[in-house]
């Protein structure tokens, strides 16, 4: 494999100005999204105080567990559950 000499990159004033404008735009979007999240959390906490939970009564964690198929409740360790229904 042939090795190339490194290419020289020059940073121009226009490039830095463009970077700053894009950075400010992204920060403003993030700030707006955070404000919406804070307002959403406030309204959902008000709803949970009044209604006793979210709209379907499930927490975020429960919704995630349901989506991925995780069953956090252990099975009871009783004899029929351990050995099945054995009849002699």
Swiss-Prot record:
Entry GO terms, CC: anaphase-promoting complex
BP GO terms, sorted: anaphase-promoting complex-dependent catabolic process; cell division; mitotic cell cycle; protein branched polyubiquitination; protein K11-linked ubiquitination; protein K48-linked ubiquitination; regulation of mitotic cell cycle
Key word Membrane present: no
Bias (Polar residues): 78-88
Main location: nucleus
Keywords: Cell cycle, Cell division, Coiled coil, Mitosis, Nucleus, Ubl conjugation pathway
Pfam families for the chain: ANAPC_CDC26
Statement: the UniProt record of this protein carries the keyword Cell division: yes
Domain of life, source organism: Eukaryota
Segment forming the signal sequence: none
UniProt pathway: Protein modification; protein ubiquitination
Compartmental location: Nucleus
Chain coiled-coil ranges: 7-37
Region of interest (Disordered), residue spans: 17-36, 69-88
InterPro entries: APC_suCDC26 (IPR018860)
Family stated for the protein in its record: Belongs to the CDC26 family.
Description of how the protein assembles with itself and partners: The APC/C is composed of at least 12 subunits.
General function of this protein: Component of the anaphase promoting complex/cyclosome (APC/C), a cell cycle-regulated E3 ubiquitin ligase that controls progression through mitosis and the G1 phase of the cell cycle. The APC/C complex acts by mediating ubiquitination and subsequent degradation of target proteins: it mainly mediates the formation of 'Lys-11'-linked polyubiquitin chains and, to a lower extent, the formation of 'Lys-48'- and 'Lys-63'-linked polyubiquitin chains. The APC/C complex catalyzes assembly of branched 'Lys-11'-/'Lys-48'-linked branched ubiquitin chains on target proteins.
Listed name of the protein: Anaphase-promoting complex subunit CDC26
